[in-house]
UniProtKB/Swiss-Prot annotation:
Higher taxonomy: Eukaryota, Metazoa, Chordata, Craniata, Vertebrata
Signal peptide: 1-19
InterPro entries registered for this protein in UniProt: BMP4_TGF_beta-like, Cystine-knot_cytokine, TGF-b_C, TGF-b_propeptide, TGF-beta-rel, TGFb_CS
Glycosylation sites: 144, 209, 351, 366
Organism: Suncus murinus
Quaternary structure note: Homodimer; disulfide-linked. Interacts with GREM2. Part of a complex consisting of TWSG1 and CHRD. Interacts with the serine proteases, HTRA1 and HTRA3; the interaction with either inhibits BMP4-mediated signaling. The HTRA protease activity is required for this inhibition. Interacts with SOSTDC1. Interacts with FBN1 (via N-terminal domain) and FBN2. Interacts with type I receptor BMPR1A. Interacts with type II receptor BMPR2. Interacts with FSTL1; this interaction inhibits the activation of the BMP4/Smad1/5/8 signaling pathway. Interacts with TGFBR3.
Name of this chain's protein: Bone morphogenetic protein 4
Keyword Ligase among record annotations: no
Residues the record lists as Phosphoserine modifications: 91
GO biological process: blood vessel endothelial cell proliferation involved in sprouting angiogenesis; BMP signaling pathway; branching involved in ureteric bud morphogenesis; chondrocyte differentiation; deltoid tuberosity development; endochondral ossification; glomerular capillary formation; heart induction
One example GO MF annotation: BMP receptor binding
């Protein structure tokens, strides 16, 4: 069974096992009577068997998601606005401009062209001043990337820093500062104090009268840590101000929470490390433009009582199976399913293969040979934004999740 169909089977069976009228809408009409019969015959055995089957189905789904166990998100888990916006842009929802929080957000076409998974990491709260630098102008901090699976190949990574406008002093409009990003090559304990061994990863000269996010390429460091299995000693940020006094050093690049700032605001402004990787399954993320679906016109669809093979509506709601606590978006999706007859002779619009035509022809003279079956002939992917078992936010592309076309095969 292909991964997409297996996913749908897991979702449907879980909802059948959970029972209740609220789940009936997800079961095709042709299957409701059969479900009722199964539930009736099961009797007292239903509870124990259902629990065991549900556990097995959930394990299958988690394995497909690349998760070792079911995520149990903590109440303190934060979904970065950047990841929400990236999901909206990637899934074709950019028309809803009022929902895009990052005004200066640009879709990372190049990084996503070789990735089907995007992960985000906040830095550890503890910061270390780097000795030998001017007051509060350089810090060393750490991102824990141990949750990245072994089979995921990282292709690129970026560090996002939020900087605020500073309007102090008469010459602030002419002020510039340079932001340098370094990889720490040796831990501080192994080097002479004041002489931290680093290598420059990226640098930028920016005007300090603008409030915005800045993105830096830290791919060389992350590739060393993940591909080459080199020790991760963290990153260092250095802010060098031009045309400004020392009293303003480090004030407008946000790498730590200010005292008057609430936890909610700081959670969205913290430095964010974003990795782009591929687990070897499926295609890379591709930006989709939302378009109104216009179902292909088929003459038989105009007749309500037509029973020929076609696509039917099937909405999968993650809240019905209790997965909405760790699946951030979408809340559900239209999966569709294929159902209907494959009559002889097969019409062109039934999207049949030569084999299906021959099989249907033989069936017309020999009923022991089954008819061709109504099955999906075209499937598409969906993107999912979720929290993994380590409370890390993941955006991933899953193939073969939506039926786009049906046919007799």
């Amino acid at each position: 069974m292909i991964p997409g169909n297996r996913m749908l089977m897991v979702v449907l069976l879980c909802q059948v096992l959970l029972g209740g009228a609220s789940h009936a809408s997800l079961i095709p009409e042709t299957g409701k009577k059969k479900v009722a019969e199964i539930q009736g015959h099961a009797g007292g055995r239903r509870s124990g068997q259902s629990h065991e089957l549900l556990r097995d189905f959930e394990a299958t789904l988690l394995q497909m998601f690349g998760l070792r166990r079911r995520p149990q998100p903590s109440k303190s888990a934060v979904i970065p606005d950047y990841m929400r916006d990236l999901y909206r842009l990637q899934s074709g929802e950019e028309e809803e401009e009022e929902q895009i929080r990052s005004i200066d957000l640009e879709y990372p076409e190049r990084p996503t062209s070789r990735a089907n998974t995007v992960r985000s990491f906040h830095h550890e709260e503890h910061l270390e001043d780097i000795p030998g630098t001017s007051e509060n102008s350089a810090f060393r901090f750490f991102f824990n990337l141990s949750s990245i699976p072994e089979n995921e190949v990282i292709s690129s990574a970026e560090l996002r820093l939020f900087r605020e406008q500073v309007d102090q002093g008469p010459d602030w409009e002419q002020g510039f500062h340079r932001i340098n990003i370094y990889e720490v090559m040796k831990p501080p304990a192994e080097v002479v104090p004041g002489h931290l061994i680093t290598r420059l990863l990226d640098t930028r000269l920016v005007h300090h009268n603008v409030t915005r996010w800045e993105t830096f390429d830290v791919s060389p460091a992350v590739l060393r840590w993940t591909r080459e299995k080199q020790p991760n000693y963290g990153l260092a940020i250095e802010v060098t101000h031009l045309h400004q006094t020392r009293t303003h050093q480090g004030q407008h690049v946000r790498i730590s929470r200010s005292l008057p700032q609430g936890n909610g605001d700081w959670a969205q402004l913290r430095p964010l490390l974003v990795t782009f990787g591929h687990d070897g399954r499926g295609h890379a993320l591709t930006r989709r433009r939302r378009a109104k679906r216009s179902p292909k016109h088929h003459p038989q669809r105009a007749r309500k009582k037509n029973k020929n093979c076609r696509r039917h509506s099937l909405y999968v709601d993650f809240s019905d199976v209790g997965w909405n606590d760790w699946i951030v978006a979408p809340p559900g999706y239209q999966a569709f399913y294929c159902h209907g007859d494959c009559p002889f002779p097969l019409a062109d619009h039934l999207n049949s293969t030569n084999h299906a035509i021959v099989q249907t022809l033989v069936n017309s003279v020999n009923s022991s040979i089954p008819k061709a079956c109504c099955v999906p002939t075209e499937l598409s992917a969906i993107s999912m934004l979720y929290l993994d078992e380590y409370d890390k936010v993941v955006l991933k592309n899953y193939q073969e999740m939506v039926v786009e076309g049906c046919g007799c095969r």
